[in-house]
C-alpha cells in the first residue's frame, strides 16, 4: 500500500500547479454562492413555513418528516411570513430542496414534498407514495441527505491546505479512498435498487464511514456548499443505475440475460435516462420557482444536457470488455499448453474497463447535470448562484476521479506483475514470456502437423528438418509492458523439429540449433540417406538480447534493446544428401531506416556452410555465403529469391569446383531484420518496448560476394548472368534472363535456360543446351553435343572443330525439314522453329568458286540425331541437299531412317550418346517443368518452387 500511495503522490505532484489553478477558479465561483457559509454552515435545518399546507394523500407526511428530523438531530424550524420572505432572498430557499442561508443549510419541506410528487421523478426513484408512507422512509431519505452533506461539507479548506503545502501523501490517500468508496458503493447498489432512499442512504453512509473522510475538510475547501440532493434525487438514481450496468457487463460470472439487460440499461439509462432525468428535474425546479417551463425552454435544457453526454466514451469502454472477452476465448487453447498470459491480459482489460465504466458514468452524469443546470439558470437571477456552485463542484470531483483513476489502473497492473513474478518463482526461474512463445509454437505445430508429416513424401527426403522462428507476439508485448517487465521479454525464439517416414521425432538429439552462437548442425543423420532442411519462417540473425527500461517522461518509459550479435551462421552437414533452402534465413540487418521505412544503413550476417559427404543442394539467400561442398555432387542454386545477377570469373581458379560469385542486388524490397517499437498503455503510462523482427524492407542496391569450394554445378538467377568457366570441367545453368556463358577449357556442361542466351563451349568436349529462347550457341574446339527441343525457339549454332552432334530429343528425324539458306543449313521442326547451323556450306562454295582453294575449317556438325536414335551424317546431308536442289526431300529422309545399317549404327552410337547425356542429367533449370526438384508448394512462392532436374536427350 505504501508503494502505491507513494506512486500516487509522485503522479499528483507534477499536476500540482494545474490542480491549484483549477481549484482557485472553482473557489472564485463557489465564493459567490457560499458567502453565507463562512460561519455556522454545517447546521442543517428542516424548514417548514408556518402557513404551509400539505396533501397527506400525495405528500411525505409532515409529521413523519418532523419526527425523523428530530430523531436524526436535524433542527426543525417553523417561520413566520416575514422570515420566509427573508429566506427567499438567500439563494431561493423556498424554490429549492436545499438552500443556503446565514444560519446554515436549509432543507425545504414544501419543495421536498413537491419534488417527490413529480411523476417523472417518482418513476426514477420509486413512487412517492411508497417512499414516504411512514416514519422509516422519511428517516431513510433524511439520514441519507444528512450523511452525504456531512461528508462533502467537511472539505472547506483545500485552497488553504494547498497554499500551506500540506502533506501530499495524505491528500493522495484521501482522494484514493474517496474514489474507491464511490465505486464500491456503486457496485453494491445493484442489489438495493428497489428504493432510492436505500441507495442514497448507502452512499451517504459509505462516504461518511470511510477512514480519513472525517478530516476531509482540511483538504477539500472547493466543495464548500456542495448541495448534492439539490441536483435532483432522480439524477443520482440514474447515475447509480448506469454505472452499475457497466459493472455487470464486466462481471464474468453474470448471467447472459443479466448482461443483456445491463447492456440495455447502460445504453438507455446513462445516455438516455440521465438526459431525461436532468431535464425533468430542472423543469420541475423552474416550475417551483415560478419560472417559465414552456416548450422552447424545455427544448433548450434537454438539448444542452444531451450535448454534455458522449456515447463515444462508452463505446471505448465497450471495446475493452469485448477485447477481454476475445482474449479469454483465445487464452483457452494456450492455457492447456501451459501459458496463461492471455488470461492475465483479459483480467487487466476487465479490471481497467470496470474502472473506466465507473468513472466515465460519474463524469457523464456530472457533465449532464452541470450543462442542464446552466441552461436552466439562463435569465434567472435566483438560479445563477446554483449554476456556479454546480459547475465548480463537478469540476473538482472530475479532477479527483481522473487522478485516482491512474492509481487504480496501476493497482490492476501490479496484480498482473505479481502473478507473473510468482509463476516464475514457482517454476524454477523460467522466463514467463519465453513460456508464452513455447505455447505459441506448440499450437502452430499442432495446426500444421498434417502438412509437416507429409513433407517426407513431398520433398522426397527420408528426413525433414523443420526450423521455425516464433517472432514477436503483440499480446506478449502488451503483457510485458503492462506488468513493467519489458526487460524480460524476448523478440522471439527458434525451434527445430524432425520428421522421418511421416513420424514426428524429437529433434534435440538429432539437430543442434543454437541461435545465441549461430550454430546449425544437422550432421547426425543416422541411417537417413537424404534430408531436407526447411526454414518454415524467416530465421532471425544469431546473437543474444539484453533490455534496459528507462524513464523518458512523467508517465513515459522505453525498454531499449541491446543486441550482442554473432557475425555468421555456421551450418554443418553430414553424410546424407541434403537440401538447404537458405532464402528464409535473414542475412540483411536494417541498422538505420528513414521516415518512410526504407533501409539506409545495413549490416550483414554471413552464412558458412560445410556440407560434408552426399549430393547436396543449397539455395542461396540475400547475403554473403561461403560453401564447402565436400564430397559428392553438390549444386548451388541462385534461382530462388531476387538477389541480383551473377558474375562468375573462374578463369584463374587453381582448384576444380572453386568459384567466386559476385552479385549486385538492385534497389528494391528484400527480407531484412529491423528493430521496431511496441507500445502498451496503462492509463496515462506509456510503455515502449524495442524488439527485432523480419520484414520486407525497401533498400538501396548493394554488392555481395560468395565463395564456393568443391561445388560441381551452379544454377543462375532470373537476371542476366555472366559465367566464365575454369580450366576444369564446369557445369553452369543460366536460369532465366539473357545469360552469357563461356565454358573456357574443360569438358563443360552448359545450359541456357529461358531467355536469348549466348553460350560458348570453348575448348573441350562440351554439352550445350540453349533451353527456351533464341540462343546463339558456339561449340568451340572439341567433340560437342547440342540439344534442341520443341518449344526451345530459334537457335543459331556455330561449330568449328571436332566430331560434333546435334540432338532433336523430342522430334523424329523424318519430321524435320532440311534446306540450304545462303551458306547455312536450316533445320525446321513441326512447330516451325528453326535451328540454323552457320556456314555449313561456306567452305564447299569457296572450293567451287576459288581455284585450288584448300578448306581451313569445318563448320559442320557431324551427326544429327532424332528422338529414337535415328541419325543422318553431315556427308549424307550434303549429298541429299545437292540431290534435292537445296532441300532434302521427305522421301529421302524416310529412306535414311529406314535403312537397316544406319539404324544399327544409330543404336550403337545412341548408347554412347545416352551415356554422355545421362552424365549431364543432374542439370537443373528453374523453369523446366519435366523433372521437379520437389519443394513444399504450400510453404513457398509457386513461382519459385519449380526447380528442375536436367533435360535428357
Curated annotation (Swiss-Prot):
Disulfide bonds: none annotated. Keywords: Calcium, Cytolysis, Hemolysis, Host cell membrane, Host membrane, Lipoprotein, Membrane, Repeat, Secreted, Toxin, Transmembrane, Transmembrane helix, Virulence. Acylated by LktC. The toxin only becomes active when modified. Hemolysin-type calcium-binding repeats lie at residues 715-732, 733-750, 751-768, 769-786, 789-806. InterPro entries: Hemolysin-typ_Ca-bd_CS, Hemolysn_Ca-bd, RTX_C, RTX_pore_form, RTX_toxin/Mannuronan_C5-epim, RTX_toxin_determinant-A, Serralysin-like_metalloprot_C. Its main location: secreted. One of its GO terms (molecular function) is calcium ion binding. GO terms for cellular component: extracellular region; host cell plasma membrane; membrane. GO terms for biological process: killing of cells of another organism. It is a multi-pass membrane protein. It is found in: Secreted; Host cell membrane. It holds the Pfam family HemolysinCabind. NCBIfam families: RTX_toxin (NF033943). Belongs to the RTX prokaryotic toxin (TC 1.C.11) family. The lktCABD operon has a complex mosaic structure that has been derived by extensive inter- and intraspecies horizontal DNA transfer and intragenic recombination events. The transmembrane domains are believed to be involved in pore formation in target cells. Pasteurella leukotoxins are exotoxins that attack host leukocytes and especially polymorphonuclear cells, by causing cell rupture. The leukotoxin binds to the host LFA-1 integrin and induces a signaling cascade leading to many biological effects, including tyrosine phosphorylation of the CD18 tail, elevation of the intracellular Ca(2+) and lysis of the host cell. This leukotoxin is a major contributor to the pathogenesis of lung injury in ovine pneumonic pasteurellosis. It also has weak hemolytic activity. This is Leukotoxin. It comes from Mannheimia haemolytica. The gene is lktA.
